[in-house]
Design a protein with these regions (language model features):
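A solvent-exposed beta-alpha-beta segment
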Residues: 31, 35, 40, 44-46, ...
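Strand-loop microenvironment adjacent to phosphate/nucleotide-handling motifs in alpha/beta enzyme folds
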Residues: 246, 289-293, 445-639
Length: 639
């Protein structure tokens, strides 16, 4: 018995049996089925000479079986993972073999060859028993494997979603050995299927009693069906239930990448991050139009080593540009971009250049050398408190740097210039936001001026994109919260009522590319950022998600220049619909280029005096709606 157990464990612990072994087992089953049927029909009266002749007859029929096995490839599956489809293949193979056998039966005996003459019903019985035997072999093997290797040590798990991929996900975790997740039921919103049994497990309704059921079942993990990702993100009630109970939540990749034909046995699950819990809609863009614009073109990206810029590099590289001219003054991050391009896109000619956008001579040499077709301008200082204390740098880098790149784009015939702006440019309350608003004004006025003078000739088109906070960026609160949680707290939030719009970096960059593709010049495109999020709620969720205990939230008060909430439109702006449901066009006043340029030149000259008050006063003159908040510059608003 011990030898049998060892053999059984050896067999079941193998990765997979070779095809020929499965085929050999099926042939043996067919042979024994023939002997058994013959023995039954003749009530056990089988002489030795009959056995020899019968074996010869059975081998003839087994040749017909091999035809069916080959056509339907019954031997190609992994037995321990057998499914209804595998059993169906066995049945179809045996039906085909039976049909061939019945035809050949009359041919063989018409020629009076030396075979045992079987009746039609005996042949049918032989094939029926063989089919049952082959199916039993697969079912028993699968059952033994599940019993021997299925352990209660797996994490007790519920699956969120039934109809849309939930069953496929359940099958995938059951075939995963050793067992990591132990299926204990499903969660659904549909009352009509609540309480039903699926795959031997109960379906539970998302209601007020769900928390108690999860406690009773001792659930430690919930897996979200791939096609239910979006719904789960918006189900904050269920998220709170799970987080409060300390249940781990796992999701797979984006639902748009799945279809009904997908192989769910290859689902790659990951424990959720805070980004997965923020309500947001899936963003789709016109990839064909973007590809037609960028393919085989020379593309310049400023700020290429930053959060937005580096993602722009990745997304644009997909469309196979002729060259990428990547500009950033941060040496080490730029070096990392160079390595990324070498390893991930070695076929693309990428020039990773360390340079400051505010160095006119250096930038002109770059434009003259590489002659870009399109410019995506993402370089900027963006930290509000830092720029509040260093307004001269905000002017010299953000405003002067933008002017340099914009002017050179016109001079060297760039087709389109796309600037990345921020919602902090709307009704600005801080230096950084005001500097970006001045950049918007300059690009718009320059676009109008050169197109008025073009007389129908092609001219550089200037497009501005405006959006809010992006998750995981260098300036995001999330990395700070993560560090504070790991350190044991407290987590610092400026105000309990402060809210922000959030978007994933890849989603924001997709919309930048979409706007850049379709923009005709002069527009400010405003992105729909979805639902605003309370920063305090974000902090609480991150604490719960980490599993940390006794971490407090400390409210420190608004920082200089900080708003309680951000806007994407000023009080004097309206929007028009655009080519994309997530993108609106801001209706803004037009500015005279000569006047704007004169004002900016004066501001830039003033920035070299490093007189903070004088610099900010001039910025307020250019942008009258700039009203400082909780800042030393508030005194200037009372003049």
């Amino acid at each position: 018995m011990k030898i049998f157990d060892k053999l059984l464990n050896w067999y079941l612990s193998r990765n997979a049996l070779p095809y020929w072994v499965i085929l050999a087992i099926d042939i043996v089953i067919c042979y024994l089925s023939g002997i058994f049927v013959f023995w039954m029909f003749f009530h056990g009266a089988v002489s030795p000479q009959h056995i020899v002749l019968l074996s010869k007859t059975i081998f003839m029929y087994m040749i017909f079986n091999l035809i069916g096995f080959r056509i339907f490839r019954t031997y190609s599956g992994i037995i321990r993972y057998s499914s209804f489809v595998d059993l169906q293949r066995v049945v179809l193979a045996m039906l085909l073999s039976l049909a061939v056998a019945e035809v050949m039966h009359y041919v063989v005996y018409h020629w009076n060859l030396e075979f045992v003459r079987l009746q039609g019903r005996q042949i049918a019985a032989m094939y029926l028993v063989a089919t049952i035997g082959m199916m039993a072999f697969r079912i028993i093997t699968k059952s033994l494997y599940d019993v021997l290797f299925n352990t209660d040590k797996g994490v007790r798990t519920l699956i969120y979603g039934v109809k849309d991929g939930g069953v496929g996900l359940a099958k995938s975790i059951r075939t995963d050995k050793p067992c990591k997740f132990l299926l204990k039921g499903f969660i659904a919103h549909d009352p009509s299927i609540s309480g039903r049994i699926l795959m031997g497990q109960k379906i539970y309704l998302v209601d007020d009693n769900l928390a108690e059921r999860i406690k009773a079942l001792k659930i430690k993990a919930v897996l979200v069906s791939p096609l239910q990702n979006a719904r789960f993100r918006n189900d904050t009630k269920l998220q709170d239930i799970l987080l409060n109970l300390g249940v781990q939540i796992f999701m797979s990749h984006a639902e748009k990448e799945w279809s009904k034909d997908d192989d769910y046995t290859k689902v790659q699950l990951k424990e959720i991050s805070i980004e997965d819990l923020l309500p947001r809609d899936q963003i789709n863009v016109d990839m064909d139009s973007i590809g037609n614009l960028l393919r085989n073109k020379k593309i310049m990206i400023t700020g290429s080593a930053g959060s937005i810029g580096s993602e722009m590099v990745r997304q644009i590289a997909i469309y196979k540009p002729a060259e990428l001219i990547l500009i950033d003054q941060a040496e080490t991050p730029q070096h990392n971009i160079r390595l990324m391009m070498q390893f991930e896109w070695p076929d693309i000619k990428a020039h990773t250049i360390v340079a400051s956008i505010s160095n006119y001579d250096r930038m002109e040499e770059i434009f003259k050398t590489y002659k870009p077709d399109y410019v995506f301008h993402a370089a900027a200082y963006k930290h509000v408190p830092m720029m509040e204390n260093n307004p001269s740098e905000s002017v010299q880098n953000n405003i002067w740097g933008t002017k340099v790149i914009a002017d050179l784009s016109v001079k060297y015939g760039v087709k389109k210039f796309v600037m990345v702006s921020t919602d902090k440019a709307v009704n600005p309350t801080n230096v950084m936001g005001c500097s970006k608003r001045i950049c918007e004004i300059y690009c718009q006025s320059l676009n109008k001026m050169i197109n008025d003078q073009a007389n129908g000739k092609p001219a550089t088109q200037f497009v501005t994109t405006r959006f809010g906070n992006v998750l995981g960026s260098n300036g995001s609160v999330m990395p700070l919260f993560e560090k504070q949680i790991k350190a044991g707290g407290p987590v610092t939030v400026t105000d309990p009522n402060i809210i922000r719009f959030f978007m994933l970096i890849p989603e924001a960059c997709k919309l930048v590319l979409e706007a850049g593709t379709h923009g005709g010049g002069g527009e400010i495109f405003v992105f729909d950022m979805g639902k605003p999020v309370k920063i305090a709620d974000l902090a609480k969720r991150m604490i719960k998600l980490s599993g940390a205990k006794n971490i407090d939230i400390e409210y420190t008060g608004l920082r200089a220049g900080e708003k309680l909430y951000e806007e994407v439109l000023s009080t004097t702006e309206n929007t028009l619909p655009s080519f994309h449901e997530k993108i609106r066009i801001a209706e803004v006043r037009e500015y005279d280029y000569n006047e704007v340029n004169k004002q900016i030149e004066a501001l830039i000259a003033l920035s070299h005096t490093y007189d903070d008050m004088a610099i900010v006063e001039k910025m307020k003159e250019i942008v009258p709606e700039y009203v400082s908040n909780n800042s030393k510059y508030s005194v200037l608003d009372n003049k």
